[in-house]
């Protein structure tokens, strides 16, 4: 169930679903697993807000366990494509593909709430049963290329070396807000809409 808010206007009362109301304030909610339908919705909202006014920041709130690499990279590419700066605010968890998205916000405008967590790891993939050996080799090569691409993005976003990212992402690597700030994935920790 999506909450509805009622707003008083000069023409009377108007009701909005909460996400439409937040969009009026240039706020986009990226919550739940990253998948194609969710990514398409986020991309459409980014493009809409950029077309409305490319000089005003867009606020992307992130709380996701991660998900599809291709869907996540489509969001990142759109964030980089539009003219408006995208501020990212991590609440809850930014894990896996969520870290790629959250750390790709405009430099100096990547935030995290005090009790939120970050997690990086290597991408996951596989082939189903009955797969031919040559198809398995193709899938393994693609997975390695994907890992290299994601590690380069994380290195660029954090200031760490690709070698350091590769080492840390070998297994699930969890970070608190303070650790994420020290690592370089965010620029500041927020508390009550104030920056620490």
Swiss-Prot record:
GO terms for cellular component: cytoplasm; endopeptidase Clp complex. Keywords: Cytoplasm, Hydrolase, Protease, Serine protease. The keyword GTP-binding does not apply. GO terms for molecular function: ATP-dependent peptidase activity; ATPase binding; serine-type endopeptidase activity. Pfam families: CLP_protease. Its EC number is 3.4.21.92. The active site is at residues 96, 121. The keyword S-adenosyl-L-methionine does not apply. SUPFAM superfamilies: ClpP/crotonase. It is found in: Cytoplasm. It is an enzyme of class 3 (hydrolase). GO terms for biological process: protein quality control for misfolded or incompletely synthesized proteins. CDD domains: S14_ClpP_2. Fourteen ClpP subunits assemble into 2 heptameric rings which stack back to back to give a disk-like structure with a central cavity, resembling the structure of eukaryotic proteasomes. Belongs to the peptidase S14 family. Cleaves peptides in various proteins in a process that requires ATP hydrolysis. Has a chymotrypsin-like activity. Plays a major role in the degradation of misfolded proteins. This is ATP-dependent Clp protease proteolytic subunit. It comes from Streptococcus suis (strain 98HAH33).
């Amino acid at each position: 169930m999506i909450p509805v808010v009622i707003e008083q206007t000069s023409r009377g009362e108007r009701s909005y679903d909460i996400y439409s109301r937040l969009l009026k304030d240039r706020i986009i909610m990226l919550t739940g697993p990253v998948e194609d339908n969710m990514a398409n919705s986020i991309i459409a909202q980014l493009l809409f807000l950029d077309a409305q006014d490319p000089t005003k920041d867009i606020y992307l709130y992130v709380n996701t366990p991660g998900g599809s690499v291709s869907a996540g990279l489509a969001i990142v590419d759109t964030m980089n494509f539009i003219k408006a700066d995208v501020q990212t605010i991590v609440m809850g968890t930014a894990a896996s593909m969520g870290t790629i998205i959250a750390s790709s916000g405009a430099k100096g405008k990547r935030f995290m709430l005090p009790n939120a967590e970050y997690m990086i790891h290597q991408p996951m993939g596989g082939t189903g049963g009955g797969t031919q050996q040559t198809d398995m080799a193709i899938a393994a090569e693609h997975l390695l290329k994907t890992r290299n691409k994601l590690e380069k993005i994380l290195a660029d976003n954090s200031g760490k070396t690709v070698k350091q990212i590769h080492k840390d992402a070998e297994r699930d690597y969890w970070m608190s807000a303070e650790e994420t700030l020290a690592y370089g994935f965010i620029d500041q920790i927020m508390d009550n809409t104030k920056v620490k």
